[in-house]
Curated annotation (Swiss-Prot):
Comp. bias regions, Polar residues: 80-92, 200-253
Interaction with RBPJ/RBPSUH, as annotated region: 128-156
Stored PANTHER family: RBPJ-INTERACTING AND TUBULIN-ASSOCIATED PROTEIN 1
Protein name: RBPJ-interacting and tubulin-associated protein 1
Subcellular location: Cytoplasm; Nucleus; Cytoplasm, Cytoskeleton, Microtubule organizing center, Centrosome
Gene Ontology biological process: negative regulation of Notch signaling pathway; negative regulation of transcription by RNA polymerase II; neurogenesis; Notch signaling pathway; nuclear export
Function text: Tubulin-binding protein that acts as a negative regulator of Notch signaling pathway. Shuttles between the cytoplasm and the nucleus and mediates the nuclear export of RBPJ/RBPSUH, thereby preventing the interaction between RBPJ/RBPSUH and NICD product of Notch proteins (Notch intracellular domain), leading to down-regulate Notch-mediated transcription. May play a role in neurogenesis.
The gene coding this protein: RITA1
Domain of life: Eukaryota
Lineage, highest ranks first: Eukaryota, Metazoa, Chordata, Craniata, Vertebrata
Organism expressing this protein natively: Homo sapiens (Human)
Length: 269
């Protein structure tokens, strides 16, 4: 009689032997065609690989080969020897020519519009679109004309153009007025009679700009304004700048006094 410990040890040894025998027949060495192309020609000559079969043929061959492998496995159980089939070439290899390439395909609506002219004209669209939808899509590519024809409200479009002419001189007049103010403030450091004459001339220039922007200016400016002018800005701005240049040249020529000079009130106060 064997002790339970000895029985357990012998059972473990027999299980290990059975596991080794079962693992031996499952491992099979098949011919590989990778080393020939990647690592040079092999030591022994091997047959050329045949053409591959389609996937559905491979599945059928696999189901048939399962029974053959099972019968071979039963025969190999008794001997527990690994017999690699090196001479047999597998039939599950790809074919060189692909006979199952798809010929027909669904139509695409992107490549025709991006990479070429459409053969069916501009009205070509997807089948799921209605005629109204196609017309709406075409309207997105249309650019409106500069002036609407036959519109019910043309006034809002022309109103800004009409308002520009009267508002132009009034908006641009603060520029010469600001220049005159700067000149009058800058000339306060000079002598008193020069400042008074300059202030009177500046007020004389500013009065027609506020009262009558277009008609009173030719009377004050003299024969230089006999030529036609398109707007009030074009013939006033050069006169003011020329006057300002003459004043800026004449002001530094007068001797400046120290802090004893009293600043008179500007004409606008």
């Amino acid at each position: 009689m064997k002790t339970p410990v000895e029985l357990a040890v012998s059972g473990m040894q027999t299980l290990g032997l059975q596991h080794r025998c079962r693992g031996g027949y499952r491992v099979k060495a098949r011919t590989s065609y990778v080393d020939e192309t990647l690592f040079g020609s092999p030591a022994g000559t091997r047959p050329t690989p045949p053409d591959f079969d389609p996937p559905w043929v491979e599945k059928a061959n696999r189901t048939r080969g399962v029974g053959k492998e099972a019968s071979k496995a039963l025969g190999a159980k008794g001997s527990c020897e690994t017999t690699p089939s090196r001479g047999s070439t597998p039939t599950l290899t790809p074919r060189k020519k692909n006979k199952y390439r798809p010929i027909s395909h669904t139509p695409s609506y992107c490549d025709e519009s991006l990479f070429g002219s459409r053969s069916e004209g501009a009205s070509f669209g997807a089948p799921r679109m209605a005629k109204g939808d196609a017309a709406k899509l075409r309207a997105l590519l249309w650019t409106p004309p500069p002036t609407p024809r036959g519109s019910h409200s043309p006034r809002p479009r022309e109103a800004p153009l009409r308002a520009i002419h009267p508002a132009g001189p009034s908006k641009t007049e603060p520029g010469p007025a600001a220049d005159s103010q700067k000149l009058s403030m800058g000339g306060l450091h000079s002598s008193r009679p020069l400042k008074r004459g300059l202030s009177h001339s500046l007020t004389h220039l500013n009065v027609p700009s506020t009262g009558h922007p277009a008609t009173s200016a030719p009377h004050t400016n003299g024969p230089q304004d006999l030529r036609p002018s398109t707007s009030g800005v074009t013939f006033r701005s050069p006169l003011v700048t020329s006057r300002a240049r003459s004043v800026s040249i004449s002001v530094p020529s007068t001797p400046r006094r120290g802090g004893a000079t009293q600043k008179p009130k500007p004409p606008w106060k």
